[in-house]
Amino acid sequence: MIDKERLAAKCAAYGIALTAQQLDRLDAYARLLVDYNQKVNLTAITTPEGIEDRHFADSLLLAAQPEAAGAVVDVGTGAGFPGIVAKIYRPDIRLTLMEPTGKRVDFLRYACAELGLEGDRKSVV
């Protein structure tokens, strides 16, 4: 779905190196997002370029900061940005996703399970 080479090049320009495994997981996340978005309105941005630029690259810029270590709480995460992307890039962080909308929490739980991020918290507030 996403252009992995394009995303990798864009991120490399900012000093962010993505592994093949991270790119595969981001691609899987994009596919889950677009598929689930047909049932539940998660985001208006669903084109591959939009997901790469506005969801993934922006989230990765935050995740690459040294301050994004330890415990990270993503309040009002919506469809999981930047939290899930940060966890894919930085598996060492302890991630808590907080979202008040139940249908989005359902997606977050589903996406985290599918992406192998099950050890982290998804909270309904």
Give the label of every model feature segment.
Residues I2-V73, K103-R104, Y110-D120:
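Class I SAM-dependent transferase core
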Residues R94-E99:
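Conserved SAM-binding motif I beta-strand of class I
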Residues A79-D92:
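Conserved SAM-binding loop of SAM-dependent methyltransferases across substrates and taxa
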Residues V85, R109-Y110:
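Short, conserved acidic/polar surface loops in the N-terminal third of protein domains
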Residues V124-V125:
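Conserved small/polar residues in nucleotide/adenosyl-binding loops
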Residues V75-T77:
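Conserved beta-strand/loop positions that form the S-adenosyl-L-methionine
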